[in-house]
Amino acid sequence: MTSYRQPDAAGHFGPYGGSFVSETLTLAIAQLRTAYARYQNDPEFLAEFGDELKHFVGRPAPIYHAARSSREIGGAQIYLKREDLNHTGAHKINNVIGQAMLARRMGKPRVIAETGAGQHGVAAATICARYGLECVVYMGAHDVRRQSPNVYRMKLLGATVVPVESGSRTLKDALNEAMRDWVTHVDDTFYIIGSVAGPHPYPMMVRDFQSIIGKECIEQMPAMLARNMAAGQQPDAVIACVGGGSNAMGIFHPYIPFAGTRLIGVEAAGLGLESGQHSASLQKGSPGVLHGSRTFVLQDANGQITETHSISAGLDYPGVGPEHAWLQQIGRAEYVGITDQEALDAFHFLCRTEGIIPALESSHAVAHALKLAKTMRPDQSILVNLSGRGDKDIGTVADLSGADFYCRPSCHGQSVKGASQ
């Protein structure tokens, strides 16, 4: 698919995308488009961005051959793109640096952000501390409770964290409140959106900043495969979890021209795709407008957004980036669901076979890779985008496992077993 050129000048990916915003934000969006058009290919901007990725984030992120997991599962060889090793512990920092650089060039001293799992909020707080910008992070009250370590990290970094009590008190509601803030502080505020969602140019801009993931993989994989005597120069499949979809788009986009590589996005199937308790917008949603763009949305017959569920705060969102909707429509990417329990099992499996604690978001991608590998040959390969580390999720996993996270006196001297045992 060498002719892939998306979006168009108006930000459309086929019938998806575009910009559906209030009149108050029209000028701010226009200014952002102009600024990004000016700097996206500017040598000085790109050099600074690359320098920050190398010296502040620690890129390039390595690719790791999960050899023990591959042997235990059987079938294809599994490789992990280690975004969890980035500074702040996830892929989110890649995009935040690019947008913060734009904010400085546009003269915006105040930054706002939404966050679900807290990783985008931590990344925003981190770069604002580095650049001397005011930072306000909106986070659903439910997510504040289940991701409390990241809340404290944001506060340590100087950010103001605003719990959102409206709606389902999750990522959707945090994004709503951030949009309201932007409307009332449009002159001095830059909104750093964390995913490939929102009005144009955000889906394109976030994708471009995150594409460093896939670009590195294309350079790294030939040597990895040759070292393990695997077939081909690139993986047979690339797998990433999809909520809004920024980590997935970051690894997918550079691979779009590689026809021999399947692109597989993994949505949160929650308690099951037929349960009504999930966040699988592409599999169970329908076209609609959410947060400024047309995409696939979980909505009822009257167009009202329905409640979502996922064990993973970062995937608990009723929409998806418009480019994912387009890639599904044209058949270049496929999207599947993984349940809460399957993600938990994969979380424990990776901990015990590789010594890596993955984020619950990333665990969804790992779970599908483990399933898929069994159907493939040993000389074939799967590349998983391990989008973040799981430190933030240990409390959630401990609660679900019946473990005593704080190891109170009653648990001293006792072994604590995980849910998968």
Curated annotation (Swiss-Prot):
The modification N6-(pyridoxal phosphate)lysine is found at residue 92. InterPro entries: Trp_synth_b_CS (IPR006653), Trp_synth_beta (IPR006654), Trp_synth_beta/beta-like (IPR023026), TrpB-like_PALP (IPR001926), TrpB-like_PALP_sf (IPR036052). One of its GO terms (molecular function) is tryptophan synthase activity. One of its GO terms (cellular component) is cytoplasm. The keyword Amino-acid biosynthesis applies. It catalyses: (1S,2R)-1-C-(indol-3-yl)glycerol 3-phosphate + L-serine = D-glyceraldehyde 3-phosphate + L-tryptophan + H2O. The keyword Secreted does not apply. The beta subunit is responsible for the synthesis of L-tryptophan from indole and L-serine. This is Tryptophan synthase beta chain. It comes from Verminephrobacter eiseniae (strain EF01-2). The gene is trpB.
